[in-house]
């Protein structure tokens, strides 16, 4: 269960995959696709390497992923000011960065709590002991 007012980490991961895919798609639609496509790929790679439910490679923990999220957010924000980017692509990039910032800010990065095994009744057919 996530902390009050925070999103669960699995939801954070799904949102990052969507945001990364959107940034990649925005880059591929622009006249100069290099910068937005690289930023979208960076977001997707950052999401794929975390040790969490939807992590593909599970190389880093949640604490390090939180730091990497802020680094990726900074890179994405600086990339919005890249020279030679047309106005429409820049606006889409900026909106995607805002969504990513909200996702990062409102996520519960605490480690998953281990599930407690429930004791099974000693009597058959589920009758009370």
What does each of the following model-derived ranges do?
Residues 1-6, 25-32, 51-61:
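Short juxtamembrane and helix-loop transition motifs at transmembrane-helix boundaries
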Residues 1-11, 111-129:
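Intrinsic N-terminal pre-sequences and regulatory tails
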Residues 4-12, 22, 37-48, 81, ...:
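Trp/Gly-enriched beta-strand/coil motifs that build multi-repeat beta-propeller-like domains
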Residues 18-25, 72-80:
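Hydrophobic, membrane-inserted alpha-helices
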